[in-house]
Amino acid sequence: MIDSTAVIHPTSIVEDGAVIGAGVQIGPFCVIGANVSIGEGTTLKSHIVVNGHTRIGKDNTVYQFASIGEANQDLKYAGEPTRVEIGDRNRIRESVTIHRGTVQSDGVTRVGDDNLLMVNAHVAHDCVVGNHCILANNATLAGHVIVDDYAIIGGMTAVHQFCTIGAHVMVGGCSGVAQDVPPYVIAQGNHATPFGINLIGLQRRGFSKEALHAIRAAYKLLYRSGKTLDEVKPEIADIAQAHPEVQPFYDFFARSTRGLIR
């Protein structure tokens, strides 16, 4: 179904069965598959392929040569009807690739709201990208990676499969991330190691001085005290009890499956 207010360039192909919402603009030489849904106000510039069981929300802008919903690169994939789900108000720049999920997970690759995926960024099968995230040019997420809200992944950075990048993390460019990065941390290098907390980013997002002091104290316990994780957990839990901003930092320990960067 194509809404009457949608504008589709005559050189583009929209297969029967696709759902195109109100005010959608599809530029020249795009291909939209039969199982695709595109929400109102979304713009596809030109030369874009949206394939598979893919849902794109409202008011997104997708730039030329992006590929969304194509078959993933997992060798076990056998053509199962897995999906891509993208939220609202995302900017997906030139040559970005977002692949559909696998049945080995829940079958869905997810991108939330208000994200910026810069040129050549890659979101592999079963990844979950939260809200307000930035993937800079050529940032690459392997399969099953989780990127929490407000995280920034620098250009030319690769994140190993099954890693989790915590909220408000900043990963510097040209890094290789092979373990989980706790919330609020700056990580850099190959393999990535911690370089303090993302102070500027947290200030911009309205964290109070008291909260920043508490987050810094938790960071120092984890990374500078010389103690083991089991030894510092009770101390960080005490800080989190008094300062709720530290709770995501503490909770991340239980979420981690690949171990924390060190």
Swiss-Prot record:
**Could you tell me which Pfam families the record lists for this protein?**
Acetyltransf_11 (PF13720), Hexapep (PF00132)
Pathway-wise, it operates in:
Glycolipid biosynthesis; lipid IV(A) biosynthesis; lipid IV(A) from (3R)-3-hydroxytetradecanoyl-[acyl-carrier-protein] and UDP-N-acetyl-alpha-D-glucosamine: step 1/6
Q: What is its EC number?
A: 2.3.1.129
The organism sits in which domain of life? Bacteria
CDD domains listed in its UniProt record: LbH_UDP-GlcNAc_AT (cd03351)
Please give the InterPro entries that the UniProt record associates with this protein: Acetyltransf_C (IPR029098), Acetyltransf_C_sf (IPR037157), Hexapep (IPR001451), Hexapep_transf_CS (IPR018357), Lipid_A_LpxA (IPR010137), Trimer_LpxA-like_sf (IPR011004)
Q: What class of enzyme is it?
A: transferase
One GO term under biological process is:
lipid A biosynthetic process
Tell me the subunit arrangement. Answer: Homotrimer.
Q: Outline what the protein does.
A: Involved in the biosynthesis of lipid A, a phosphorylated glycolipid that anchors the lipopolysaccharide to the outer membrane of the cell.
Q: Which family does it belong to?
A: Belongs to the transferase hexapeptide repeat family. LpxA subfamily.
What name goes with this protein?
Answer: Acyl-[acyl-carrier-protein]--UDP-N-acetylglucosamine O-acyltransferase
> What is the protein's species of origin?
Erwinia tasmaniensis (strain DSM 17950 / CFBP 7177 / CIP 109463 / NCPPB 4357 / Et1/99)
Gene behind the chain: lpxA
